[in-house]
Design a protein with these regions (language model features):
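Solvent-exposed loop/turn and edge beta-strand elements of beta-rich ligand-binding domains
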Residues: 1-166
Length: 166
């Protein structure tokens, strides 16, 4: 079914992202970053399509304070450990944090992807962010839905410290 294609695509996308990204800690500072989402899928003809009008929410769950990641007040009682930084653990943590955010009705910023399937969350302070798709999006006869995921600003990508993460 089409949902299977969506799940397979998102797993491959997330795994490739997490394989190249590991957690780093930077000194507390005023440097800002961004997270760009490029949302694509495969239609019923197995052709790559840009997924426009997909709504993504972003929550800052931790911030950098004196070279230490500190829980934001609205997430500090979640009792979810972020110590394990493996891809599998991060996937589980993101799902748990998103469920917690929904249960506690935590406010977030929301953006939609454009016709190229892109959106960018800018001016982000150092910390860990939870990103989740709100609902699903259709393209042709296929329906697409992304699993929640975590991104750290800055991130270590292929040996380089990156403040602007795609």
């Amino acid at each position: 079914m089409k949902v299977r294609n969506i799940i397979v695509f998102m797993i491959v996308f997330l795994m490739s992202t997490f394989m190249n990204v590991s957690t780093i800690h930077a000194e507390s500072g005023s440097r800002k970053g961004s997270i760009q989402i490029v949302y694509k899928g495969r239609n019923e003809l197995n052709q790559e399509v840009n997924l426009s009008d997909a709504k993504f929410s972003i929550y800052q769950v931790q911030y950098m304070s004196t070279d230490t990641l500190t829980w934001k007040d609205n997430f500090k009682d979640s009792h979810i450990s972020l110590e394990d930084t493996s891809a599998e653990a991060r996937e589980k943590q993101a799902k748990q944090l998103y469920k917690y955010a929904q249960q506690k009705d935590i406010s977030c910023s929301l953006q939609e992807t454009n016709t190229l399937g892109r959106t960018t969350f800018s001016n982000l302070t150092q910390g860990i962010y939870l990103i989740a798709q709100e609902g699903s999006v259709e393209s042709g006869k296929s329906q697409f839905e992304s699993a929640p995921f975590l991104v750290e600003i800055p991130s270590l990508v292929d040996g380089s410290v990156e403040y602007n993460v795609t």
